[in-house]
Amino acid sequence: FQAEDGIRDQPRSRGLGDVYKRQDLELYLKSSFFSDVALSPDGKHLAFQSKSDEFTEGLLVARTDDFLDPKKGLEKATVAKAALENSGDDVLRVKELFLCRFNWVSNSLILVEICGKNFDRLRGEIFTALGVFKLFNIETKEFKNFLYPLEPAPKKGSMTFADRYRPATFISKYDDESILMSVAENKRGFRYAHLRRVFFDKRGVKPNGTDLYVSKQPCQFKVGYKANSACNIPYIFILDKDKKPALTFSSDLDGVYAHYADDKTTKIDIDLEDYTPFAIKDDLLWMYGVSGIGAHNVSLLNLKTKKIQKAVPSDCHSVISAMNSLNEATPYAIDMECDGKKEIIYFDQEKRDAQILSQLAPSFPDKNISLGNWTDKNDKAIFSVSDSSVVSEFFMLDLTKGTLIPIGRTSNVPKDKLHKMVSKKFKTRDGETIYGFLTLPKGEVKRLIVYIHGGPYGIRDYDQYDFSEQYLASKGAAVLKVNYRGSGGYGKNFMEDAYKEWGGTLLNDIADATIAVQKELGIGRSQTCAFGASYGGYAALGMAYKHSDLYECVAGGMGVYDMKILRDGSDESIYTYQDDYEETAEKFWGDDQAQLVDFSPVFNADKMNSRILMWHGLQDPISPIVHLELMKEALDKNNVPYQAFTMSKLGHTFGEKEDIKAHLPVLKDFLFDEL
């Protein structure tokens, strides 16, 4: 990286101590051995999704009994491996492929979905479900291409791209010979969802099979010359208990609608844009309420009365996981946060699985809990717990033996090196309730560091592993994360009421939580710093003049510092090229010029009284480098000391491991006033 100082001296040279710092950081950056595990329908095999420093990305399948036998272990238990090359796909214009999901579809076959990672000039870094699937046979070891969405161009005649492109979406396992997929077929310029039974022994990579239902309502609509597609949403078809289509969905300019899977694809005229449907039982459609990245409640739509009713207590928010019994789509329990605390909400406490869960859960307090993946005999399942202090830990529940057997932890970091995020509840200055997390070091609290999440709208912090947080806590920092107003997972009003409040309500919420924790820990301004990236970088610099009485130092990465050029689009962020940029900008930031100046760090440099560090990627397309340049000019003009560095290859991200090992120790030293 390139270091730049405004007025301050150059950072001191680095010696042997820095080597140890990098070694400590290496521990927290080490990739997990596996990220997910699934039990085969007969329970005889475990499939691990792997992408670690030791193993190539792909699947590793082991015999269950041998794997759980301490005398044999993984090496002797392994029966099959499938590796995925991370190269891109030029035809689909994807720069990188990765394994995003997998499902056991028989005792010997695993369906693997391949997704794409790309960079779009208009949308930035995007992760895309491509409709690419591979089939892994653990007996023959064949890892073959199963579905590919784009047919080759015909040798004679012509065929439009729309006619050639037929993406498929996995809906459900059907039987030992086939699965159910939704295939979007083009007809007269529109796409229609086909619920199709696709057989494993089919030839080629076309999504050929037997149609069980064809929607008469297009799942794609046009606005001008552009088309919007709802064809590949995971819930495009919802099945009944017999795996027959019950509902399908469509969208238009006004909303998202359910349709009965009848002869006419009859529309249910209720806008479901704020919901994600996921199951149906009798006349009740089960749905998650969606705000940003988080589902914030569970609601039921009565298909007869057309009324929607919440199914969980009013103080519950932020769905963590749903628990389902074998072959049932409706959950018997939901793991949620209620008033900021983890809690399991039971819908049917008489069910066997609910009683099992109620016996297991108390042994894992304040953990994110999941129970599912039952075998066909309904006697074995996967039980998992996760949070910041264990990362993820998997167990096999064996009812015939009455045992809960550890499978493994996903993390390579020893538990004694991990720190627990404790949920917190705060009252704001205007009487609202907000939530957050406080992570304490194992020894003396040397600093309070407020780690501000990005977004800001729709994003939120969870009790989960974060290498930056764990690294800072290992050095003696108490780390505070605040889900200020505007964060996702707490409801649409909680998010949208914070629009046009970047430098107002949002910063006040963070400040109010900071004051509460300072009092709790007996810590003052001299030991308190704030940092973040993206919106968090903006907020950190905003704290230097809005709430400088609370923060001795602030560190902002990849931040937007001039809201006037953000608002009018002259910073040339990738988002300014979108057709609806003006509409979005008005909604998020408004047109009050005085407020835009008040909320912009570049126009308030003379009021900044905290130590300042900034870092930025020269390739950042979302918060262009002009924001850092303008901020430095403003600080220089007002003789305000600061430190800054840029990284030549970095975009709007912390980067790869080597990038993080370069800049995170610098950030740590600054926050601890050791730079």
Predicted regions and their residues:
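Single conserved hydrophobic/aromatic residue that forms the stacking wall/gate
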Residues: 1-20
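Beta-propeller folds
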Residues: 18-380, 388-390
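Hydrophobic/aromatic beta-strand patches that form the interior of the parallel beta-sheet core
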Residues: 247, 332, 422-424, 450, ...
